[in-house]
């Protein structure tokens, strides 16, 4: 006998009672309430045996039997009535089969008796002995027993449920373990259970399953059955013939025979169908609710938690008052099994919903009330889950969370919740979850993963949410402890990226998260790397351009210019040289750009010359043909007009000295060119650039034949070489006269020339420089001088360079600009022992620091100067001037900080020694002897300062007052020079620094307030030179005094003096600078370099005085204008970008005079001022003053055109500033419009020639200049012209075909679009509202043209042939490529103006919603259109505009498809559009979609537009978001079927609708068929069954049609399974 699982048979040694594990799960092997067909059978208890413990307990008896322990019967009766065994439901031979089926059983247990009706050991116990087996239910046991029977004959195949695989048995056994302890109710009578997998035959019988009842003919044992066996013989009538042909043939011969036969078969089928159809009406009624007391309600809930109580019994008394949050809490408290809890929720919900209908409300109101109730119920579920999750730490929290998650997920997937509300709440909760509860929400995320990522609306939000959480976790202080959480978040992000790539298209936040996303992927993996690259490209295409134009990629030439400018601060020639060679492939263009940079008037300083020379030397070593590049540069005559060619000749001179430039090659080229026959008509006519180099070449190191050839060419060019020799001889005599100790006497015939002329050629300058260097070197190499210099200071001073001689040599070489020779002279000067000369040498190195760093002499000179200082220190003649100079120079050398520290220690030691020395008694009588009239004043002061004794404060005050009086009288009858007095003041300061600073500040303030403040301009430079006052401190003091009080009598003169304090001397002025004056120039240069903003403030304040002065001060106005213009030019050329910004902020719009001075300065730099006579080229920090007219200038259109023509990579900031001045000038409005027209034409011209200078002209101008009102802006004009360009040009014959060549309109549209993209940063955040309707109309027109073209092609396909067919094919191909271009261009415009489509912007327009819907419809229909050439599926070339190609080349390239890009743009719009626009677009596309656009066949349609508001909320599995076609990195070739999914091969979604007529179009039988389409008056789609009425065991008595909807509506039949 096989015991049934409901009988509660326990395994060996198990307790008799059921143990509840708290899981709330139970396995009911029999449906509750199923009628028991065996209950009416007579039952007789089988005598059971009693053995020693453990005893066998008979649970197979009837319910009324008492379990008693009786001794086993010795012998069973043989003639037991068959009915007694029939109640057990097993044949008599079961015991035999059972005993033979346990080969694995141990021998310790008693063997089974084959003659007993029931085995001694239970079948469950036998199975428990088998390794790996567990408790199995009755069905599994029955299957095993059936399996152990002898196999049937080979000719018959066994039943499908027999010989089940072991894995199925194991799975059933494993599933039984959870519910094994929950036994069946004891009062349920036992009955035989039919196997669930047995085939059902007519009459509710089961094939090959006939339990032994004792009354079957097979069970009757007689002689026949004993001998022959039993078989079921079919009774055949004797009148039956072998064939029906004779009877049917006669009927078929008649004409109506077939109809009769057909009607007979049809009637038979109709009767069968009518018999099998469910015709009874629906008997479904939700179980009613009754009012119960609290005790009965609790008892009912306990019964509900007990899985043994059938639900049909509980459905009679469902108590009132259990709803909402209370229902869920009760289920959690009572541990109601999840399935039974869901059953209760459905019962309550069905009653609540049906209550709305019973109130007599209308249908629409009922639906609204039902939806409201579902939303409230969903909110209760949300609160319930939140409460369980937030109760972390309480008892059984893990079990409660598990139960709550299981229950809510079951309610979700049973369609008992509002999915939109629930998932939105889930994402909101996940976003707000702290780190301590985030793991729970991540576990729940796995449950709703596919539902969230089914639509982009939720998928994008989830992607940003996870990335934000990961970013916060990584940046958290407790990041190490959050490592598991970080890994889990990274895993989710990686899975989302690889499986749902489209959800990672984040137009708003890609730049924020792209680095974080790349860290989550394994970029070493090809798949991960390809997905990330394509994803980055997709995001870049849908992103709005950055606000700043500077973030865009710079052209190589501008990048090279930045590298050249960086040398001024980094001084790294090697790295810049290598980077420049990598930046530009054309080396000739690179050399050309370097020479332009060195000679442009828009850069400052002579250091560019030596930078260019060193770079050219390195490039020549690297293999660049520098000579040819330089010669070709000189041959361009148009370049010499805009450049300072003297710098170019200087570079060539340096190259000739180092033998880097081939003079012979240049002369050969000059002879081959034929310019040697050039003859000037006038001596004042300048030579051309290539010929002028012949005059500038240094000749000292040239071979004799090359020298002679040069002289010959000069003679033919009209230049006499003898003039060079005479000029050199005159200049040598003049220099020798000024330096007799170095060069000795000169010939008396030479004529002195002082000062030196400024137009000397580099041939003369180079010869004189080398002569001076040779003379200084020979002067310092005299052995007698060198020997005496080491022992005797007097001899050293007699034979070494004196300060005057050093100043003269330095002045000559600086006027030449020959700093390489000056570096050699400074090297020779370091051997002398004069502290003044050494300090001056250190100041010279500091003044030309950038040039010497490029030359490579700075470090060596500094080390030599430090050695000279150490030598002086050993000799006991320490100089404070030298220490100050060395410290200032060492601070600019990063590698000499230790040396600077030692120098500062020496300086502090000297200062402390002076301040701490005790004054001698004689110092009390010193003040009375100090008098400025004393002829021995300086001698006494030197003795006092050089003595070891200190100076008290009274003595300091006396000496300070005496020196100050000398300074104040320096303009008249002063006995001492100002520089000398200031030097003594600097020597006096170390004794009492604080008191001295206080006294000097008090004196300066007194001068500022007095009427004699004019002397301040005379004494301030030397005070700055000796270090007693700094320029920055003085400027700060002046501004503080001007703000504090107005007692300064001469504010106007003070502002002018302050301005002129910063202006360098003019070119003609003598440059003989002593130590103090040179240091002042050094301080001014450093101030202009470090504090340019304060310099602009000084210029602004000074220029403001021009408007307030009277006519009598006209000369002063001109002088002020000169100074301001020169200083502006210096500041503009030192740092153009920042200087232009400062000018826009501080000068423009302040004063008319400021604008005028700035205009003149710019005109001088740009060469626009006719009065200026050309450019003002800087040379050695000097400028040529040119008178300016301070009157206002009226802007002219020709000036704007010329400024635009002058725009290049160097003049760009100055042209920007000039155009800005033209815009801001007070003139008529039409002038502004004309200027805008000029700039727009320049933009079009530059775009056509692929230049980008116009972008810089517009990008850095002021806000008002960039955005003019309405269409006067350049970008708006480009947009206007872009939209005015016709989409398609009609053919001249007027037929429906399109013009074969519309390239002109396409090229024009490309130019306008390029301009719009370059200026896209100027689009406001709110977006221009006028663009939206225009874009919508353009896309509508594009769609209409596509529809008409499709109709035209389909209508003329059959009629066209021959030449007409070829012409039509060409026209169609041209149309499709134009369509692809315009579609991509309009998509780009949508991306640029995406902010105009946002919800705040759309709220201003009343028709915003229809425009948004039309825009989405157009994008979907065009992108998913199936064109013959599949141009929308081709990878866009370069700027993703289609290009002409051969048929063989029409293959998809790796990258983003234009179709995918279009859908990405649609996704970015959907992210901003309201849900109503999305719903209207979906409604239109599913009802009125054009036939050529198979939108509904594409799963991306549902992904982008879902969830649909009016879609049924039934159990329909919608397709999840599919990875992009390009996400895999490989794009398949376009197939003729027009499958637009591409990428991975995705199977077509199955049609969820049965019974679709075969005549339907293909567009209806598709993946979107669940959208309930209307066809011929019938609704085709899944029937929306109410999930609340899908109740099992709803009624106490099961009916024939116990369903919520009549099964007859679905052609359902009675099928017994």
Swiss-Prot record:
Transmembrane segments: none
Source organism: Aspergillus fumigatus (strain ATCC MYA-4609 / CBS 101355 / FGSC A1100 / Af293)
Highest taxon in the source lineage: Eukaryota
Subunit-level organization: Component of the srb8-11 complex, which itself associates with the Mediator complex.
Gene transcribed to yield this protein: srb8
A GO BP entry: regulation of transcription by RNA polymerase II
Keywords, alphabetical: Activator, Nucleus, Repressor, Transcription, Transcription regulation
Polar residues bias locations: 40-51, 99-111
Protein name: Mediator of RNA polymerase II transcription subunit 12
């Amino acid at each position: 006998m096989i015991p049934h699982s409901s009988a509660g048979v326990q395994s060996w040694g198990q307790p008799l009672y059921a143990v509840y594990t708290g899981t709330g799960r139970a396995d009911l092997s029999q449906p509750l309430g199923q009628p028991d067909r065996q209950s009416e059978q007579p039952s007789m208890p089988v005598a059971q045996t009693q053995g020693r413990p453990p005893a066998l307990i008979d649970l197979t008896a009837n319910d009324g039997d008492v379990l008693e322990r009786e001794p086993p019967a010795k012998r069973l009766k043989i003639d037991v009535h068959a009915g007694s065994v029939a109640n057990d439901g097993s044949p008599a031979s079961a015991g035999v089969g059972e005993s033979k089926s346990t080969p694995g059983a141990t021998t310790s247990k008693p063997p089974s008796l084959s003659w007993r009706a029931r085995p001694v050991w239970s079948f469950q116990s036998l199975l428990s002995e088998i390794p790996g087996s567990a408790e199995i239910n009755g069905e599994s046991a029955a299957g095993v027993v059936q399996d152990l029977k002898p196999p049937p004959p080979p000719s018959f195949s066994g039943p499908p449920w027999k010989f089940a695989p072991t894995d199925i048995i194991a799975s059933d056994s494993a599933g039984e373990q959870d519910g094994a302890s929950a036994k069946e109710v004891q009062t349920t009578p036992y009955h035989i259970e039919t196997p669930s997998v047995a085939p059902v035959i007519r009459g509710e019988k089961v094939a090959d399953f006939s339990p032994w009842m004792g009354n079957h003919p097979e069970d009757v044992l007689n002689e026949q059955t004993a001998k022959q066996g039993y078989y079921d013989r079919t009774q055949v009538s004797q009148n039956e013939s072998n064939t029906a042909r004779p009877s049917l043939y006669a009927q078929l011969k008649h004409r109506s025979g077939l109809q009769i036969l057909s009607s007979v078969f049809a009637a038979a089928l109709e009767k069968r169908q009518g018999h099998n159809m469910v015709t009874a009406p629906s008997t479904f009624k939700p179980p009613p609710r009754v009012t119960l007391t609290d005790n009965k309600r609790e008892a009912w809930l306990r019964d509900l938690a007990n899985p043994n109580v059938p639900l049909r019994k509980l459905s009679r008394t469902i108590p009132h008052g259990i709803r909402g949050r209370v229902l869920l809490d009760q289920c959690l408290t009572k541990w109601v099994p999840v399935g039974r809890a869901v059953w209760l929720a459905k019962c309550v919900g069905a009653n609540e919903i049906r209550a709305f209908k019973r109130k007599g409300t209308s249908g629409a109101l009922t639906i609204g009330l039902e939806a409201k109730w579902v939303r409230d119920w969903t909110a209760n579920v949300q609160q319930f889950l939140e409460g369980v999750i937030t109760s972390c730490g309480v008892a059984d929290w893990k079990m409660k969370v598990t139960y709550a998650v299981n229950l809510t997920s079951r309610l979700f997937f049973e369609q008992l919740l509002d999915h939109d509300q629930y998932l939105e709440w889930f994402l909101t909760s996940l976003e707000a979850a702290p780190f301590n509860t985030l793991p729970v929400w991540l576990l729940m995320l796995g449950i709703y993963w596919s539902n969230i990522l089914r639509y982009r609306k939720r998928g994008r939000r989830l992607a940003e949410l996870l990335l934000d959480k990961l970013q916060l976790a990584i940046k958290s202080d407790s990041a190490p402890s959050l490592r598991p959480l970080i890994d889990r978040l990274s895993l989710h992000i990686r899975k989302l990226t690889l499986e749902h790539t489209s959800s990672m298209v984040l137009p708003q936040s890609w730049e924020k998260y792209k680095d974080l996303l790349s860290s989550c992927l394994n970029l070493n993996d090809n798949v991960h790397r390809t997905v990330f690259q394509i994803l980055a490209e997709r995001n870049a295409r849908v992103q709005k351009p950055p606000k700043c134009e500077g973030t865009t990629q710079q052209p190589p030439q501008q990048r090279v210019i930045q590298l050249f400018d960086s040398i001024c601060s980094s001084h790294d020639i090697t790295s810049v040289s290598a980077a420049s060679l990598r930046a530009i492939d054309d080396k000739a263009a690179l050399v050309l750009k370097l020479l332009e940079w060195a000679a442009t008037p828009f850069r400052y300083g002579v250091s560019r010359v030596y930078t260019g020379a060193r770079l050219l030397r390195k490039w020549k070593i690297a293999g660049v043909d520098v000579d040819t590049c330089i010669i070709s540069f000189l041959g361009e005559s148009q370049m010499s007009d805009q450049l300072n060619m003297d710098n170019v000749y200087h570079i060539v001179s340096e190259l000739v000295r180092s033998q880097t430039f081939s003079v012979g090659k240049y002369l050969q080229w000059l002879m081959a060119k034929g310019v040697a026959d050039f003859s000037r008509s006038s001596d004042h006519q300048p030579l051309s650039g290539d010929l002028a180099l012949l005059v500038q070449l240094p000749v000292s190191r040239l071979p004799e034949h090359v020298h002679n050839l040069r002289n010959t060419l000069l003679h033919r060019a009209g230049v006499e070489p003898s003039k060079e020799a005479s000029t050199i001889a005159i200049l040598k005599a003049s220099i020798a006269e000024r330096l007799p100790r170095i060069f000795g006497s000169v010939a008396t015939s030479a004529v002195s020339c002082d000062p030196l002329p400024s137009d000397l050629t580099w041939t003369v300058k180079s010869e004189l420089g080398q002569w001076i260097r040779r003379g200084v070197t020979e002067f310092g190499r005299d052995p007698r001088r060198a020997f005496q210099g080491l022992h005797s200071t007097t001899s050293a001073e007699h034979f070494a360079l004196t300060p005057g001689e050093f100043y003269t040599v330095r002045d000559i070489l600086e006027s030449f600009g020959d700093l390489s020779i000056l570096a050699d002279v400074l090297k020779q000067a370091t051997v002398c022992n004069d502290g003044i000369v050494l300090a001056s040498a250190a100041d010279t190195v500091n003044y030309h620091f950038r040039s010497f760093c490029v030359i490579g002499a700075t470090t060596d000179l500094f080390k030599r100067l430090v050695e000279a200082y150490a030598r002086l220190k050993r000799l006991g003649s320490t100089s404070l001037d030298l220490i100050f100079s060395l410290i200032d120079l060492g601070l600019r050398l990063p590698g000499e900080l230790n040396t600077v520290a030692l120098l500062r220690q020496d300086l502090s030691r000297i200062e402390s020694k002076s301040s701490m020395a005790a004054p001698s008694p004689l110092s009390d009588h010193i003040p009375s002897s100090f008098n400025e009239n004393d002829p021995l004043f300086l001698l006494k002061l030197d003795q006092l300062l050089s003595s070891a004794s200190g100076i008290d404060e009274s003595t300091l005050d006396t000496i300070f007052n005496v020196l100050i009086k000398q300074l104040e009288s320096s303009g008249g009858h002063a006995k001492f020079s100002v520089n000398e007095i200031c030097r003594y003041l600097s020597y006096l300061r170390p004794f009492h620094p604080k008191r001295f600073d206080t006294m000097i500040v008090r004196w300066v303030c007194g001068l500022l307030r007095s009427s004699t403040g004019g002397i301040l301009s005379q004494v301030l430079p030397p005070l700055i030179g000796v270090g007693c006052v700094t320029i920055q401190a003085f400027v700060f003091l002046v501004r503080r005094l001007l703000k504090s009080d107005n007692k300064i009598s001469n504010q106007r003169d003070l502002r002018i003096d302050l301005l002129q304090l910063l202006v360098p001397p003019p070119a003609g002025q003598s440059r003989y600078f002593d130590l103090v004056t040179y240091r002042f120039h050094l301080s001014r240069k450093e101030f202009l370099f470090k504090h340019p903003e304060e310099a602009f403030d000084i210029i602004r304040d000074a220029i403001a005085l021009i408007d307030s002065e009277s006519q009598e001060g006209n000369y002063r106005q001109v002088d002020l204008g000169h100074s301001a213009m020169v200083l502006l030019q210096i500041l503009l050329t030192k740092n153009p970008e920042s200087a232009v910004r400062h000018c826009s902020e501080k000068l423009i719009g302040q004063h008319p005079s400021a604008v005028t001075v700035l205009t003149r300065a710019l005109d001088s730099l740009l060469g626009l001022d006719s009065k200026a006579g050309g450019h003002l080229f800087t040379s050695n920090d000097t400028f040529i003053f040119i008178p300016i007219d301070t009157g206002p200038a009226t802007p002219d259109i020709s000036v704007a055109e010329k400024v635009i023509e002058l725009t290049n990579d160097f003049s760009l900031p100055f042209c920007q500033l000039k155009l800005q001045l033209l815009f801001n000038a007070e003139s008529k409005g039409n002038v502004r419009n004309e200027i805008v027209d000029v700039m727009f034409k320049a933009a079009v011209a530059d775009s056509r020639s692929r230049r980008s200078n116009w972008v810089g002209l517009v990008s850095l101008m002021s806000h008002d200049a960039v955005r003019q009102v309405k269409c006067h802006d350049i970008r708006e004009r480009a947009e206007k012209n872009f939209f005015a360009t016709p989409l398609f040009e009609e053919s001249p014959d007027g037929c429906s075909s399109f013009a074969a060549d519309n390239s002109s309109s396409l090229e024009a549209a490309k130019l306008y679009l390029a301009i719009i993209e370059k200026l896209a940063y100027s689009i406001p955040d709110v977006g221009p509202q006028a663009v939206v309707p225009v874009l919508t109309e353009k896309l509508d027109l594009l769609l209409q043209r596509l529809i008409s073209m499709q109709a035209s092609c389909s209508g003329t396909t059959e009629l066209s042939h021959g030449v007409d067919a070829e012409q039509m094919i060409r026209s169609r191909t041209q149309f499709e490529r134009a369509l692809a271009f315009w579609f991509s261009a309009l998509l780009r415009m949508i991306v640029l103006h995406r902010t105009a489509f946002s919800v705040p912007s759309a709220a201003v327009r009343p028709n915003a919603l229809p425009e948004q819907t039309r825009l989405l419809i157009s994008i979907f229909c065009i992108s998913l259109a199936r064109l013959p050439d599949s141009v929308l599926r081709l990878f866009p070339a370069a700027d993703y505009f289609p290009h002409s190609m051969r048929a063989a080349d029409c293959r998809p390239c790796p990258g983003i498809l234009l179709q995918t890009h279009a859908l990405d743009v649609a996704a970015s719009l959907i992210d901003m559009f309201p849900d109503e626009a999305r719903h209207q677009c979906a409604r239109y596309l599913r009802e009125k979609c054009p036939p050529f656009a198979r939108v509904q066949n594409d799963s991306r349609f549902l992904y982008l537009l879902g969830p649909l508001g009016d879609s049924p909320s039934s159990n329909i599995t919608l397709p999840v978001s599919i990875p992009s076609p390009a996400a895999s990195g490989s794009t398949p070739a376009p197939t003729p079927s027009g499958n637009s999914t591409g990428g991975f091969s995705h199977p077509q979604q199955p049609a969820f609708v049965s019974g679709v007529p075969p005549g339907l179009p293909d567009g209806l039988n598709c993946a979107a068929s669940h959208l309930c389409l209307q066809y011929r008056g019938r609704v085709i789609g899944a029937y929306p069954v109410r999930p609340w009425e899908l109740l099992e065991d709803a009624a106490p008595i099961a009916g024939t049609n116990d369903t919520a909807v009549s099964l007859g509506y679905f052609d359902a039949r009675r099928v017994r399974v």
